[in-house]
Amino acid sequence: MTFKSGFVAILGRPNVGKSTFLNHVMGQKIAIMSDKAQTTRNKIMGIYTTETEQIVFIDTPGIHKPKTALGDFMVESAYSTLREVETVLFMVPADEKRGKGDDMIIERLKAAKIPVILVINKIDKVHPDQLLEQIDDFRSQMDFKEVVPISALQGNNVPTLIKLLTDNLEEGFQYFPEDQITDHPERFLVSEMVREKVLHLTQQEVPHSVAVVVESMKRDEETDKVHIRATIMVERDSQKGIIIGKQGAMLKKIGKMARRDIELMLGDKVYLETWVKVKKNWRDKKLDLADFGYNEKEY
């Protein structure tokens, strides 16, 4: 039996539904989600395997005009995937008109000279006539291999997109075991789950300034739980106060919600200990970025 495989990048502006799509395809959460822009900071690999095919999806940070060294890292990390894949899914939202950010990405995609499928997400939010206008507008800018409208949240047309990808795969290796769904270690996934809860629960000024470092993660033989110690890094004392909350209430809530997700992922009982530290202006310091997992070697 012939086995087919390939690498597929998911590119687009922030908040267009790239991580929602990847999680839907994988059938579980491997990329965190929130309604805050620039939630995804690292490339996230999702490995979709059947008996005859393997698609290695690479979810990327939302491409934006960077204002910090962290922003530079995110954008370069996203564009670097163009050197690693055979196909690009360029995702745009059906309920927003094409903007300068989309045009900037399109120019890079043209230069890359690899097949691009336009994926119009959030079709559940618009009238069919509006969707047709969106398709015509984007087609006037670039010769896309295909255009596929979907709803990543509801799953509408996602199987059609997957079939299109598998039909176009070439004969190749099975790069990863069938039971492996991502290349990231558990520590990374744990840190992302804690950061996701901070994004959900805190005010607008806080999310972009937060990083999470898992200091230790090991099984406690006495309690038979995985003991995790995680530090939430922020840039200002005021942000530290917001995350801790009155009498520690917010930090407890973050920890409780994160622990539930971590236990689901690990299939194990977890004791999660969280701390908050201030590291001023860490988003503009390359050494701090590397310490917190945002390393230029990634691209």
Swiss-Prot record:
All residue ranges annotated as the Era-type G domain in the record: 4-171
Key words of the record: Cell membrane, Cytoplasm, GTP-binding, Membrane, Nucleotide-binding, Ribosome biogenesis, RNA-binding, rRNA-binding
Region entry G3, spans: 59-62
Domain KH type-2: residue ranges: 202-280
Residue ranges, annotated region (G2): 38-42
Annotated positions binding GTP: 12-19, 59-63, 121-124
Xref: HAMAP family: GTPase_Era
PANTHER family with a match to the protein in the record: GTPASE ERA, GTPASE ERA, MITOCHONDRIAL
Name of the protein in its database record: GTPase Era
Lineage of source species: Bacteria, Bacillati, Bacillota, Bacilli, Lactobacillales
